[in-house]
Amino acid sequence: MANGMDRASGDYNDFWAGRDYLNQMKPMKAALLMSHGFNDWNVMPEHSYRISKRAREMGIPTQIYYHQNGHGGPPPMKMMNRWFTRYLHGIENGVEKDAKAWIVRENDNRLTPTAYQEYPNPAAEPVVLHLGAGAPKIGKLTRNNLNIKEKETLTDNHTFSAESLAKTKNSNHRLLYVTSTLKEDLHISGLPSITIKAASSKPAVNLSVYLVSLPWNMNKRAKITDNIITRGWADLQNHSSLTNGSALKPGVFYKMSFDFQPDDQVIKKGQQIGLMIFSSDSEYTILPEPGTKLTVDLKETIITLPIVGGNAAFKAAVD
């Protein structure tokens, strides 16, 4: 397994393709009741999202239940009972007319999910946000294209945790861009994505991005949803191919687009949404010696958020 996964390059290969359930779904006929946690950072939520999406595309009866916690956590017994009564025992009970997505809201009991027509929320629309300079302090995250030829640089150092980087107001080891304080709640539903143009001082560099809710809640009893919205990682060497990465030319800028992990979260009034860009993540990436410089071209970097109500909702909450 250690050899097959090719940890050194990080390239997608036959080892990973053989473990991708999407490649094994063609014979599937059974109705699918999928359960997952949006903050499962072991088996990440993209797996349930991709599988349930493909099942729907195949015409398979599909229902999904998401809670806001980590690994494990089944749907309510009543929900499972209705599903198995219909699709295991063959008793007509109308479950196919029920909502297709059930999501536990941030402070609710996992046994009382909220029903939605589908996941992602059909009312979610892409909102494109641009970056405004601020490093090493905090820059802006705004709908306005600032159209500035600005570049900002961070220094990789995995000895600083992502949490510590998000909490501090000044750091050379991350770039942080935030919205204005929300005047209304804002509902994110789906897969945020980022297009980033960046350069490395060395032939390889980790790329980590977090979407966070600020100010950071430092209470020991804070829930993960109080602080982390979602996260994403990439290898800039794979900017043009997932299967055939190539060494970076130091100082040369490369453009890359990738998704964050799927999420469904309501960000509360009074918070700010922050995009944090850093390099090595002490919890999830390989950990090279500190010192690599990662430079981001702000003009050519955007983040897209799937927001329920789209630009109108974002404008009402932020502008």
Give the label of every model feature segment.
Residues 25-28, 57-58, 95, 120-123:
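Extracellular/periplasmic catalytic domains that process cell-envelope and extracellular macromolecules
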Residues 38-40, 68, 279:
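Residue-level signal for short, function-critical loop segments
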Residues 41-47:
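Conserved alpha/beta-hydrolase "acid-adjacent" motif
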Residues 55-72:
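Catalytic histidine neighborhood in serine/cysteine hydrolases
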Residues 28, 34-36, 40:
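Short beta-strand/loop motif that positions the catalytic acidic residue
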Residues 65, 72-319:
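C-terminal, loop-rich substrate-recognition/catalytic regions characterized by aromatic stacking residues
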Residues 1-27:
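Accessory cap/linker subdomain of secreted extracellular hydrolases
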